[in-house]
Amino acid sequence: MKPRMNGGYLVHHVGLLNGRTYQKLLKNESLAKFRSEQSKILTALWYCEDGCATFTDLSIKTGLANNTLTSMVKKLEEQGLVTLESCTKDKRKRYVGLTELGKKQKSIGEKVSYELGEQFYKGFSDKEVAQFEGYLERIISNLKDSNE
């Protein structure tokens, strides 16, 4: 019999601690206009070629369920960080785009992510970081394959 495998639990726990640590670091940024959970959506938009995406694209990139994504995008819109626009070709499609304020928040997000990465990998060599991330990519691939 194989020994008990705790990878799923450990990854889940890392995710929780990662989010809490991100939020703690974000609180140190007086110009930050977003919370750690919202950074998932903002990061996806910051790295879109044209700075906007459909709800479907954002759901895939962030892993958020549609109902969660909808309420979070609405809050980001109220905060003046994103805009919502209907597609001219297909009225059922709506695009989420960054406002100027949303674009300006990118440098804060990158700074906090860098600081988080420094804490996350404290004591790891470059080789260990590459190896660890390689394992995570394999796990993601395995799970994607099993969900197709």
Show where each model-derived region lies:
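Short, hydrophobic-biased segments on the C-terminal half of alpha helices
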Residues: F55, V73-K74
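Residues in the recognition helix of alpha-helical DNA-binding motifs
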Residues: V14, M72, Y135
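C-terminal regulatory/oligomerization modules of transcriptional regulators
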Residues: M1-K2, K127-E148
